[in-house]
Amino acid sequence: MRFAILSVHIAAASVGLLAGFVALYAAKGARLHRRSGTLFVYTMVAMAVLGAGIAAVWNVGPEVNIPVALLTSYLVITALTAVTPAAERSRALDVGLLLVACGVAVFMIGSGLAVATDGARHRVPAFPFFLFGAIALLAVVGDLRVLRSGARAGASRIARHLWRMSAALLIASLSFSVQLPKYLPKSLRLPWLLALPLLAVLVTMLFWLWRVRVRRPVRGMVIAAPRGALVTETA
């Protein structure tokens, strides 16, 4: 049973990573970008749910893996709602997702402080707790702004979508880089090689955020796609 669930988890993660990188480098707003991005969202949620279940049932670092699974699901779902037309969005869903992010932020930062003072839990140092807690806290700030001022528009909307999708891909890539050495020959366990996916996501995310926020307006980039229609930001 565990092997079957783990196999589906790994398969979802593999498909999700591939779809995520395709969406990251595909022409923004094109059909390939939208379809691969949607596939990335679905597979990341599936991967996260299965990962949380594995962590809870078989005690595989639950204090880290369960909140990270919640954070990953939260990031891709809110990235998707960021480009959903306001008329099709639910405020109750937005509030519920905000509470999830708040819970993750409080738990991870609190756990990080506990690990820093009492020693590592399950051989996990304090840094990952603080890292994921900071990501969740940053997302909470963005959600509060949306709930207070309404849905973002234009470049702000695109930036919200971009960084959340990229952060989820970064988390998936980090997990991949941590687990991959177990299956590689010793000669290929090179730190710079394992860090390449992380660097690729981080650099590409920063580039697009710079392009969206500094080089505005962005011609031909989709800011919403209601029911298959293409809505673009024009100069």
Question: What are these model-derived regions, one by one?
Answer:
Residues 1-235:
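Alpha-helical membrane insertion/targeting regions
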